[in-house]
């Protein structure tokens, strides 16, 4: 028996790391899409929280986007990757917990 395909919840929220230059392109308006590794089964309506990292460390800056368009099966996309389109974003600042090892 074939297994039914399980879609993620439409209101799912995922956190991903992002570099400073990527977040700058988003907030300045020059980028409205992302090419990403499919770490989760994203779908339209999901929220991505992009956490800015500089030299491997979180800066506390985040950008929230809601997926408006998405494809992972187009001819030019590597297996395991997807293109995500979004219309708007929200910028926020969050506290960073400094872990002392």
Language-model features, listed with the residues they occupy:
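Catalytic phosphate/metal-binding cores of nucleic-acid and nucleotide-processing enzymes, i.e., regions
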Residues: 10-93
